[in-house]
Amino acid sequence: MSSTSPNLQKAIDLASKAAQEDKAGNYEEALQLYQHAVQYFLHVVKYEAQGDKAKQSIRAKCTEYLDRAEKLKEYLKNKEKKAQKPVKEGQPSPADEKGNDSDGEGESDDPEKKKLQNQLQGAIVIERPNVKWSDVAGLEGAKEALKEAVILPIKFPHLFTGKRTPWRGILLFGPPGTGKSYLAKAVATEANNSTFFSISSSDLVSKWLGESEKLVKNLFQLARENKPSIIFIDEIDSLCGSRSENESEAARRIKTEFLVQMQGVGVDNDGILVLGATNIPWVLDSAIRRRFEKRIYIPLPEPHARAAMFKLHLGTTQNSLTEADFRELGRKTDGYSGADISIIVRDALMQPVRKVQSATHFKKVRGPSRADPNHLVDDLLTPCSPGDPGAIEMTWMDVPGDKLLEPVVSMSDMLRSLSNTKPTVNEHDLLKLKKFTEDFGQEG
């Protein structure tokens, strides 16, 4: 760089001030200054530095300052527990002289480990989601594979001895909105003796160098301590994409730790199932893909499953749809995902409300009282056309709150909502998913 940029100058000033505070023994102040300096240096590398030589020089300085910051962090942490001799700049802290025993016997007393495990406690699902297998329409193959991997080993452990072992890694992949996360909720409900960890990338990615892989390690450690356990990682592609030259060092280290922990070398991974979900399985790293022994394609629902979804989403709401209507809706929604059908039904449920809003006439009808549904009354008001016998000209603002009887959801409401809702899955993505299934997966 021909001239020093303001950000680079700021980084140099911060690093210089950090070194001064370090020498003066103000280690907490020095630690903060080192960390701020590194942030400025990294900004310069990413957005301002010209030429590989300049970048290499700045990266070397960053490594040096980060190493010193880690030592100060370790020293300050130990100082809280007991009085220690201050470290001189450039000298290893007492903790470093003992060597890195993070995998040793004393790890259980490590406050850093406890802090990381406390962070992960929020990922444990304490309250079971109330989703049963029967609430999941279709996907029989996926349900059977999950029962085989999760429910059977808990209920009949004697079946899985010797060479017959349950699956330890299952990948659910398919278009968005097909029920992958919903299936995981059903697993959490049905496997009521298991500890269920629901993880997203934000739970495992930290801004501090080296902390993300520690979080991954501690996640698996927690799972081993709470066996039988299920680790569900939604959108796993955001954590375990293919390795490339462009990815950051932090991402590479997280991936490596995942591979080590899923392989389970030197540790007992019995009783732990890793359940992953993704919409774009082709971006997964090949080594991660291999760790998932079962790779199950969750396709778009079949017509009978789509018909069942319309029923499930309508629930107990008053409607006039017949079995034939549900079958017709199932046929008309080819290419729609479960999430798309959910949106169609939600929109259809609003159609009676819109009729109330736009009505210019109401008529009196007989129906259940709002105060006591078992008691029928004759003075309820429902929207009607101006030509209906008994039509009264009024708007919804004139209707008393406890006297409105909204129209039931009808087939015409469903068809109107269907015409306004387009599928969210395109043909190109489906072809890629089918190709991946042919190469690596199995049908769900």
Curated annotation (Swiss-Prot):
Effect of residue 58 to M: Induces thermal instability
Ranges in coiled-coil conformation: 19-82
Gene Ontology MF, one: protein homodimerization activity
UniProt-listed Enzyme Commission number(s): 3.6.4.6
Modification Phosphoserine, positions: 93, 102, 108, 410
InterPro entries attached to this UniProt entry: AAA+_ATPase, AAA_lid_3, ATPase_AAA_core, ATPase_AAA_CS, MIT_dom, MIT_dom_sf, MT-severing_AAA_ATPase, P-loop_NTPase
Subcellular localization, as worded in the UniProt entry: Late endosome membrane
Domain (MIT): residue spans on this chain: 4-82
Signal peptide: none
Claim: ATP-binding is one of the keywords in the record: yes
Mutagenesis or variant effect for residue 66 to D: Reduces HIV-1 release 3-fold
Membrane topology classification: Peripheral membrane protein
Tissue specificity statement from the Swiss-Prot or TrEMBL entry: Ubiquitously expressed.
GO terms for biological process, alphabetical: angiogenesis; autophagosome maturation; autophagy; canonical Wnt signaling pathway; cholesterol transport; endosomal transport; endosome to lysosome transport via multivesicular body sorting pathway; ESCRT III complex disassembly
Function: Involved in late steps of the endosomal multivesicular bodies (MVB) pathway. Recognizes membrane-associated ESCRT-III assemblies and catalyzes their ATP-dependent disassembly, possibly in combination with membrane fission. Redistributes the ESCRT-III components to the cytoplasm for further rounds of MVB sorting. (Microbial infection) In conjunction with the ESCRT machinery also appears to function in topologically equivalent membrane fission events, such as the terminal stages of cytokinesis and enveloped virus budding (HIV-1 and other lentiviruses).
Subunit structure: Proposed to be monomeric or homodimeric in nucleotide-free form and to oligomerize upon binding to ATP to form two stacked hexameric or heptameric rings with a central pore through which ESCRT-III substrates are translocated in an ATP-dependent manner. In vitro, associates on the inside of a helical tubular structure formed by a CHMP2A-CHMP3 polymer. Interacts with CHMP1A, CHMP1B, CHMP2A, CHMP4B and CHMP6. Interacts with VPS4A; the interaction suggests a heteromeric assembly with VPS4A. Interacts with VTA1.
Protein name: Vacuolar protein sorting-associated protein 4B
